[in-house]
Each structure stands twice: as structure tokens, then as C-alpha cells.
Curated annotation (Swiss-Prot):
It comes from Sus scrofa. It is found in: Cytoplasm, Cytoskeleton. PANTHER family: ACTIN. This is Actin-related protein 10. SMART domains: ACTIN. Gene3D superfamilies: 3.30.420.40, Actin, Chain A, domain 4.
Length: 417
């Protein structure tokens, strides 16, 4: 907990900030520079061979409730070591988070843990607080998908978002496919056995470790050559010389030979255009095309990239090169209206930027109180405001009793003096 905690506004204890990601959860306290813990978003059940993912959108509500209850209990009483009744909660969420998941999560926090208030904060908006800017094009490359959302003058431009199922999960699937097809394993019994004969599938944790330790993103010229050789339409395209092979130890007894050609080709699926000519780079350009023309220049010059997948070596350099390459094509050249693109460097690792923004916002105790859903309101109504609902109650009914009416959204998230 921060030093001099009792000297805040009215001596109120600092808020708990939770970024509940599909692969990893970041958790800590407002006002701190980094999360106290980054743990896999899973729980272990007796009799279950594999850990159970907590963030699931296709299971029934009661099952989800029990998973979230157990997982948040672990956060509070194994990692944070604080009483949940004493502290407000800031939850970092995706704007595409299904309503039933948000409602189940808030039910767990209010009914089971009895927290004083909950603020559900969009991850893209929170990322801007770390940079002190009002307008940016924010791309979140996470585990399940890559999601882009423009923020202009502190307001998310919701009709210009874009998403593709390109993230850590897609990389793991591609990596596993290539490893099983091409790689060999040395065991105590024999050398260079085919991987499928030794193990039918590769655990998710091993795939992630191989990805992080060995894979990287090639530059644009090399990447285009790798893609051309992969599809080999004209039949005479040569692949660039691969990087060195890597020997990866499996469970202390086996050695997996990871081919160099796999190390640089796996990540190309993020930049290969599919049948609809979509990739991570076109996500940004297509979103920009949907924005009002007088906002495009400012948004293009303020790109913010967050999410764990964007931490791969060479990712940002390649993304910027792809954008500058694509913007010269006829589809964008005549209509986009700008050719200058710049990427910000946030003051935290890409996977923790949204959490840090939530920690900054959670430290503003007066504003936090005026923007949070209070326990009293939730107990009366059993519901929370939802941006995609047309049946939201008046603002003065939602926020803490005794607090002044909340400022306009623009002012609440503005960094202007």
C-alpha cells in the first residue's frame, strides 16, 4: 500500500485496481507505479486435469459467478491481503465485454465481497491517462483479439471501433501447428523423434514460453518475402535465410528442436492479409477512415499500442512500417487525408498500461467517488449502467449519495488545467 496512506482526501483508503484479462490478471492499488501481482486468469478445481479459465463468455451465469468468486477471493486474500469492504474497486474492462459478464462480476463484488463502490473503466481510455493526452488511436493487442478504438477529446468514438481475432491465442495455435508438423524431440530413449509421437498436444504454458523466448517479428522487407514464400503463388519464391535453431528443454528429460524458420514465421499471421484484406495494420487504417476527416491527422499522430502481444520484439517497428506501406496503396492514398503516423511510448510495459491508467484514475478520490457505482444504488436496483443500454437511469441516481453531480465525461477524463 502507498506510503502515508491516511493522508489522502478524508483519510479514505486507496482503491483496488483490477485488470481482468483473458490470459493474465493485473491487480494492485491505486497510486502505485505497477501492479502487486500478475497472475494467470485461471483457478484450479479438485478432480479437474486442467486449470479453468475465469474469463469465459459462453458459460451459464451461476457457473461464471462461482469461478469469479473463487478467483477474486485469491486476489484479495492471497495477493493483496486487504479487507474488500474497506476499499473502492476500479475494474479495467474491454468496451466489447458482454453485459452478462460485467453484471456477474459486479454482483460478485457487491453481494459477496461487499465493496463500497465499483468503477468499470474502458481499457483504451485508461491508457491515455498514462500519457496525459486527450486524443489517440488506441490498439489493444491482447490474448483473444486485437481491438482498436479512437479516443477524441476524452470521448471514445464507439462507432469507429474495429476488431480481429488476432492475438496471443492465434499465435499459440499457429505455433503448435508448426511445431507438431516440423519439429523433432530428443528423449533418453532415442534422438530426433517426431513431436506428435512423443506428445499429442503442447500445453498452453509451454507454447507461451516458447513464443516469448524464441519468436520475434521480422522487418517489413523480410516479412513480405516470408509471406511470399509461404504462399508461393508463382512457384519460384525463395524464403530468406532463417535464424538459428533453438533447443528448448521439455520437462527436464526431452529436448525440443525449434526450427529457425518457425521463430520468425509464426508472428506473420498478424500481418498477413486475409481474404478480406484485413490485418492488424489495416485495423488502424480502417478505423481512421471511419473517423471524421478533421480528427484523422491528430489521431494518426497519436497511436498508442497496448496489450501483451505487442511486446514481441520488433512488433512496433513492423506495425509502423506496415502502416506506412499500406497508406500508399490506392484504397487509402486518396481518401485518408494524412500520411504521418507516430507511436507513443507509455511509461509502463504494454501489458500494464491500462492497469496504470486505472491506478492513476483511482488515486483521484473525489472524481472516483463521483464516477463509481455505489453499493447503496446497486442494492436498491440490482443493476449497473451500461453504455450499450438505452434504459440507463439518470446519473444522479447512480453515483455516491452526498457527492456532487459528476462532471461531464470530457472534463472527467481531460488532462487540461
Amino acid at each position: 500500500m502507498p506510503l502515508y496512506e491516511g493522508l489522502g482526501s478524508g483519510g479514505e483508503k486507496t482503491a483496488v485496481v483490477i485488470d481482468l484479462g483473458e490470459a493474465f490478471t493485473k491487480c494492485g492499488f491505486a497510486g502505485e507505479t505497477g501492479p502487486r501481482c500478475i497472475i494467470p486468469s485461471v483457478i484450479k478445481k479438485a478432480g479437474m486435469p486442467k486449470p479453468i479459465k475465469v474469463v469465459q463468455y459462453n458459460i451459464n451465469t451461476e457457473e461464471l459467478y462461482s469461478y469469479l468468486k473463487e478467483f477474486i477471493h485469491i486476489l484479495y486474500f492471497r495477493h493483496l491481503l486487504v479487507n474488500p469492504r474497506d476499499r473502492r474497486v476500479v475494474v479495467i474492462e474491454s468496451v466489447l465485454c458482454p453485459s452478462h459478464f460485467r453484471e456477474t462480476l459486479t454482483r460478485v463484488l457487491f453481494k459477496y465481497f461487499e465493496v463500497p463502490s465499483v468503477l468499470l473503466a474502458p481499457s483504451h481510455l485508461m491508457a491515455l491517462l498514462t500519457l496525459g493526452i486527450n486524443s489517440a488511436m488506441v490498439l489493444d493487442c491482447g490474448y483473444r483479439e486485437s481491438l482498436v478504438l479512437p479516443i477524441y477529446e476524452g470521448i471514445p468514438v464507439l462507432n469507429c471501433w474495429g476488431a480481429l481475432p488476432l492475438g496471443g491465442k492465434a499465435l499459440h495455435k499457429e505455433l503448435e501447428t508448426q511445431l507438431l508438423e516440423q519439429c523433432t524431440v530428443d528423449t533418453g530413449a532415442a534422438k530426433e523423434q517426431s513431436l506428435p509421437s512423443v506428445m499429442g498436444s503442447i500445453p498452453e504454458g509451454v507454447l507461451e514460453d516458447i513464443k516469448v523466448r524464441t519468436c520475434f517479428v521480422s522487418d517489413l522487407t523480410r516479412g513480405l518475402k516470408i509471406q511470399a514464400a509461404k504462399f508461393n503463388i508463382d512457384g519460384n519464391t525463395e524464403r530468406p535465410s532463417p535464424p538459428p535453431n533453438v533447443d528448448y528443454p521439455l520437462d527436464g528429460e526431452k529436448i525440443l528442436h525449434v526450427l529457425g524458420s518457425i521463430r520468425d514465421s509464426v508472428v506473420e499471421i498478424l500481418f498477413e492479409q486475409d481474404n478480406e484484406e484485413k490485418s492488424v495494420a489495416t485495423l488502424i487504417l480502417d478505423s481512421l477512415m471511419q473517423c471524421p476527416i478533421d480528427t484523422r491527422k491528430q489521431l494518426a499522430e497519436n497511436l498508442v499500442i497496448i496489450g501483451g502481444t505487442s511486446m514481441l520484439p520488433g512488433f512496433l517497428h513492423r506495425l509502423l512500417a506496415e502502416i506506412r506501406y499500406l497508406v500508399e496503396k490506392p484504397k487509402y492514398k486518396k481518401t485518408l487525408g494524412t500520411k504521418t503516423f507516430r507511436i507513443h511510448t507509455p511509461p509502463a510495459k504494454a501489458n500494464c498500461v491500462a492497469w496504470l491508467g486505472g491506478a492513476i484514475f483511482g488515486a483521484l478520490q473525489d472524481i472516483l467517488g463521483s464516477r463509481s457505482v455505489s453499493k447503496e444504488y446497486y442494492n436498491q436496483t440490482g443493476r449497473i449502467p451500461d453504455w450499450c443500454s438505452l434504459n440507463n437511469p439518470p446519473l444522479e441516481m447512480v453515483f455516491d449519495v452526498g457527492k456532487s453531480q459528476p462532471p461531464l465525461m470530457k472534463r472527467a477524463f481531460s488532462t487540461e488545467k
